[in-house]
Amino acid sequence: MPARERGAVAFSLALFGILSTTALPSWAAETLRIGAIPDQNPEKLNRLYGLLAKELSQKLNVPVRYIPVSNYPASVSAFRTGGLDLVWFGGLTGVQARLQTPGAVVLAQRDIDAKFRSVFIANTKSGLQPISSIQGLKSLQGQRFSFGSESSTSGRLMPQHFLQQAGLKPSQFAGGKAGFSGSHDATIAVVQSGSYEVGALNEQVWNSNLKNGKVDTSKVKVIWRTPTYVDYHWVARPGLDKRFGTGFTTKLQQALLGIQPSGNGKTVLELFGAEKFIPASSSQYRAIETVGRQLGKIR
């Protein structure tokens, strides 16, 4: 064989070898891939889910890898297509994911998720006073208002639901619409800076930022706490038992429920703003699905 042909064959074989090893990463078939809605800043999420991956790997004796996503819809899409095996969803995104992925299983929620709340915050220069009832939300008409992510349960869906109960539409805010900051942390920032006069976000994130000194209470304050509703939960893809062995999904649930407030687990729970994870079921989220359909977020 001429030298040129031998070179071409060698190059083709080398290229095939590269493609065959990179088309499917070696960790993809054997690693549990976990993800979460990006509801806070990436630095905190990377730390939280990095620690959780380590905790689960030790409990399950399988490699666990955290794979971040760019936005809420991306978490639902990655779960549907198999890019993520286990995802920490909000109430709405969890319902969306399960409707798009038949056989998906709700595994757990935090001890705070069965009775969750959102808070409405206001810039102190807005002159807005504390609100004592849902009907009091009418006082926000004409204000610059920001939700968090468009697909957030605590930062958009439920706040809009309560606004609707008060008879206030997003078109009645300043500029004829509400803004979307993208995350709970960002909502605090845009209201605190005065870019928006009012915003709605996850109460747990607000309390965490307050505790860590990241809120200037001379510039922003809580004016209303919503009634309770069910929110975040862990959802697993179908087929994990086939991939990791019989009973794996149950073991995964037990691993989450078994995280203790000591050692690495203590930090994980603190970052989640919880004392423990508790069992959860899909039936708890029927009200969220109903509100999602009413507001056009589920079709």
How would you name each of these model-derived features?
Residues 29-32, 40-51, 235-236, 240-299:
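An extracytoplasmic/periplasmic, membrane-proximal ligand-sensing/linker region
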Residues 38, 118-130, 230-244:
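A bilobed periplasmic-binding-protein/Venus flytrap-type ligand-binding module shared by bacterial periplasmic
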Residues 51-60, 153-180, 210-216, 290, ...:
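Ligand-binding cleft/hinge of the Venus flytrap
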Residues 88-101, 164-165, 190-193, 197-217:
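A ligand-binding cleft/hinge motif common to bilobed small-molecule-binding domains
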